[in-house]
Amino acid sequence: SRASLVEAISRIGSVWCVWSHLVQKRYYFRLQTSRPGPMAKSDSFFIRASCDIGNNNATEWNQTNIDLGAYVDALGKSVLRIHNIAVSITDADGASPDLLADKDGAAQFQISTQSQTGLVLATNKGLVASGMVNAEETSGADGVAGNVSESYDNLPQLWTNGYLVAVETMYLSGQASTGFKEAVTVSVVMECTVESMTKDAAMALALSQQ
């Protein structure tokens, strides 16, 4: 009868709606679970290092190692992201370094994933951070600078996502000019997190930084 036909069509429509809803829900669940999530990362922490860069750039090049072995393991897919670096250029006690009377002084530093024997350009693939301080003694007697300028022109905080490091050692190095009366010390404090990557990606990054 016509009524039976209408009822049958209605039941088929109901079954179709339920089946379609289940298929869409299953597809949405699969889509959500198949999307790659963000890389796991730690809370931020700080790594500190200092280097005596002397006061005779004609003959001195000084470098100190920064051990990252506790944080970086390319084979284990663990890498270090540096978010910020704070830099201090002082004497050995943390005070302003003295200059010779009426002399200028320049102090440069760099942090690199490769050991260096001198300053390198920002285009060097191993360079993580660099900067300089220029100072002038204006009183006519040995003492602290009357004029100072600084240029920290290459730091991780200048970049959108900081700087990712996959090597187990970085190198803090630098030099200072003879206008300084005493040896200059550069100290850095780096805000970092540890993140996970795929083994292949971590190894490729490590090789590119060596």
What are the residue ranges of the model-derived segments?
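Short hydrophobic targeting helices and cationic amphipathic motifs
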Residues: 22, 28-29
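Beta-rich globular "head" domains
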Residues: 62-118, 123-124, 191
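Extended, solvent-exposed segments with strong compositional bias
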Residues: 112-164
